[in-house]
C-alpha cells in the first residue's frame, strides 16, 4: 500500500491517509507532501514529475517486478514545512514525537482580528472554566470567511482562532 497525503488537506483526506496507513497490516508506505492547500496538491498531482517520482517506481516494483529499489525506500517520508525539507522514518508516528496538550482559554491573545481572538494554554482549566461564544456565520460574511480591511483581503477576520503565547524555541508540529 502506498498512501500519499498532503498537509494542506488535513481536514478530510490527510486524516484518512494516516488512519488507513495505521490500520493496514501488509507492506505499507506513507508520503505526506508539503502542499499547502487543495489547489497546490492538485497542481502537484497534475505534473508528470510527480507521477515519475512517486507513483511509477511503486507500480514498476509491484506490478512489473522491476528491481528498482522501491523496497529500500523509507516507510515514511514527510515534508517538513517551514524548513522546506523532507524527513524519512521507519514508523508513524515518528519515534521522537512528544505529546503536549493545549487547552482553550478565555483570555484574548491580542494577536489577530478574528471572530474570537482566543488563546491556547498548557495549563489545564478548572472544571468550571467558563465558556466563550461568537456569532457564526458572521453577519458581515458575504464572500466566505475572507474579510476585507485597509490592507486588502484578511483571511482570518471571519474565522475562529486560538493562539499560543510566543514560543521560546522553534517547534515542529508533526504527528497525530
Could you describe each region identified by the protein language model?
Residues 3-5:
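Short beta-strand/loop motif that positions the catalytic acidic residue
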Residues 13, 40-41:
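Extracytoplasmic/secreted cell-surface and envelope-processing proteins
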Amino acid at each position: 500500500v502506498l498512501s500519499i497525503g498532503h498537509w494542506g488537506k488535513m481536514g478530510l483526506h490527510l486524516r484518512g491517509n494516516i488512519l488507513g496507513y495505521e490500520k493496514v497490516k501488509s507492506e505499507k508506505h506513507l508520503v505526506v507532501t508539503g502542499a499547502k492547500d487543495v489547489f497546490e496538491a492538485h497542481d502537484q498531482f497534475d505534473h508528470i514529475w510527480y507521477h515519475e517520482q512517486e507513483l511509477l517506481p511503486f507500480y514498476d516494483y509491484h506490478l512489473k517486478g522491476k528491481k528498482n529499489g522501491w523496497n529500500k525506500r523509507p516507510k515514511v517520508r514527510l515534508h517538513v514545512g517551514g524548513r522546506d525539507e523532507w524527513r524519512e522514518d521507519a514508523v508513524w508516528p515518528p519515534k521522537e514525537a512528544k505529546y503536549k496538550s493545549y487547552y482553550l482559554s478565555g483570555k484574548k491573545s491580542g494577536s489577530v482580528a478574528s471572530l474570537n481572538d482566543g488563546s491556547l494554554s498548557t495549563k489545564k482549566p478548572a472544571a468550571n472554566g467558563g465558556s466563550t461564544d461568537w456569532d457564526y456565520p458572521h453577519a458581515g460574511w458575504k464572500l466566505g470567511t475572507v474579510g476585507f480591511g485597509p490592507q486588502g483581503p484578511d483571511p482570518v477576520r471571519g474565522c475562529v482562532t486560538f493562539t499560543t503565547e510566543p514560543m521560546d524555541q522553534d517547534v515542529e508540529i508533526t504527528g497525530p
